[in-house]
Amino acid sequence: MTTALIFAGGTGRRMNSRSKPKQFLEMHGKPIIIYTLEYFEYHDDVDTIVVVCIREWIDELKGLLKRFGISKVSRIVPGGETGHDSIYCGLKSMKDICKKDDIVLIHDGVRPLITKQLITQNIEAAKKYGNAITSETARESIVRSTDGEIICEVPPRSQMYTAKAPQTFYYGKILDLYERAKRDGKKSIDSAHLCNLYGEAMHIVVSTPNNIKITEPADYYIYRALYEAMEGQQIFGL
């Protein structure tokens, strides 16, 4: 079985949106979270979806699922204090529906320009290599600094990637890593970071360049422009 675990627990403080969290902001009458969920809803290889959501917005999400016909969501789980905690909450909630050798795709609810092909590539790579980390090749030079003032390293751009999502694993393995982190008192930025903390080898699936995460106000307008451009291509057959 393949499960999509969608993280929609962020409050979106950087979006300066006081009325609602960023994942519930609308474009053309549809919330961002629904655009994201639809890709997994309509993918033949995804059997079920689990969503981690802000507790106060769970009822709102339930209404949206019904309104937009999202039927694969089997449960909605309250999030934790951090992204790490929220993913762990989601993984724990799946113990009664997932076997150790099932596949789980961990994805951001505010990353709505994923593609069917990228989901397929993640599933296939995870089955073959044990995991799949969607990553984009670096377009500009990346520098490293330990104090925020002095550059101590400029790694070769050809070796640099940006980790994105989905990040896909065997369920038993990724759950074990989060449980180890809890015992050890460790926190991670994302699941790829957690794998690195424990010395796990990871396999790259190259991302599409438009697989953006909506974090700040400018991201929303970039997303809208990209979405409308893709819609225009379909309408005019470009």
Where are these regions (language model features)?
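Conserved N-terminal catalytic core of the sugar/cofactor nucleotidyltransferase
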Residues: I34-D101, K182-D184
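Hydrophobic packing residues within well-ordered alpha-helices of enzyme cores
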Residues: M15, F40, L61-L65, N122, ...
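Conserved core of the sugar-phosphate nucleotidyltransferase
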Residues: L113-V205, L238
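Short beta-strand-to-loop acidic/aromatic patch adjacent to the donor-nucleotide binding site
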Residues: C98-V110
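Hydrophobic helical membrane-anchoring modules
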Residues: N211-L238
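Short aromatic/basic micro-patch
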Residues: E26, L113, T168, K213-I214
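Residue-level signal for inorganic ion chemistry
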Residues: I6, I33, G90, D108, ...
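N-terminal glycine-rich phosphate-binding loop and ensuing alpha1 helix
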Residues: T2-D59
